[in-house]
Amino acid sequence: MRGGSIANAAPWNYRYLAASYILSRNNSYIGRNVNMRIAQVAPLTEAVPPKLYGGTERVVAYLTDALVELGHDVTLFASGDSLTKADLHASWPRAVRLDPAVTDHFVPLFMQLEMVARRAHEFDVIHAHLDYFGYPMLLRLPIPSLTTLHGRLDLPELPALYGVYDGVPVVSISNAQRFPLPQPNYIATVQHGLPKDLLDKGPGSGGYLAFLGRISPEKAPDAAIRIAASAGMRLKIAAKVDKVDQEYYRTTIEPLLSRGDVEFIGEIGEHQKSEFLGNAAALLFPIAWREPFGLVMIEAMACGTPVIAYNNGSVPEVLEDGVTGFIVENERQAVDAVGKIGALDRDRIRAEFDRRFTAHHMAQNYLKLYARLTKAGRTGKRSNGHANVGESLLT
């Protein structure tokens, strides 16, 4: 792990960073191949990868390791309990969610941003995963940068914010994610990916349907319970319950768990997913909101397991109806789809995952963006990506 104490570092100076960046870029491509020096800036909420649930940090982990495997020089700014193939710069000793000493989450965040800024001249590109928290810094650095938007974009304050930060290059994780917020400077859509050998294809012979992820109204596990019951199938639920959703769990979900055909397993880790998903006849994904991506869908595909999902958010971009699962509009159609899952080819489903959703595929798409941004930087113009608005990298 490299990096220094923030207490011993001098305050960062933008003109100094600009000069250092120009010198380092002039030297960095002499006698070198196209390998890049990349900073990945992860949220500090969870470790990278997280011990259990945590979609953003998992994607950052997969992307970072894939970039290293492809031969690039990557530094990961994350919590000190992270595990990575890259150089780790510990921005805080451990995941903030697990640190009882942290009462103000902005303190670790501001320290992390300071560390990134002081080392910015070492990199060809900075890739942030902090949503809008990094924008004031990124706009003022002379280093090409981009930010992947991992969360929901329907918050009422965001249009005003992106009226101010309209030049920050951002990447959506699905085209559907952009719908409530068209203002940002979208330079591409890059879908998530998983390591090819992370999950194994299973036989689907367990005689149950699966629900995986988080207990919350927008994920609608209550709908999954009703669908499974109407289809005459057992349902296994592997999910976490956040504090904010405990009342929903207590009043809506817990009373349904007394049924003999529903089993609540709780939160599971990465090593348990192959068995859980691989033995399931199908994954139920009856979402009640515009899901930005839905990582559990491609986890199921990696296990060869079809997905029955509501036609909402990113679902039509991820699933191919009648091939990798069924896209439905309501519970009745979902029940009908359960009766058709035997017609789907689990080998074909896994093959579609290999073709579209591996971590290396995701990394190659991001490398195209890094190269475009750094090329613009080498011409003496700091790219804001406007020429590429709306481009999609979904291949």
What name fits each language-model region?
Residues 15, 21-395:
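Catalytic cores of nucleotide-sugar-dependent glycosyltransferases that transfer UDP/GDP/TDP-activated
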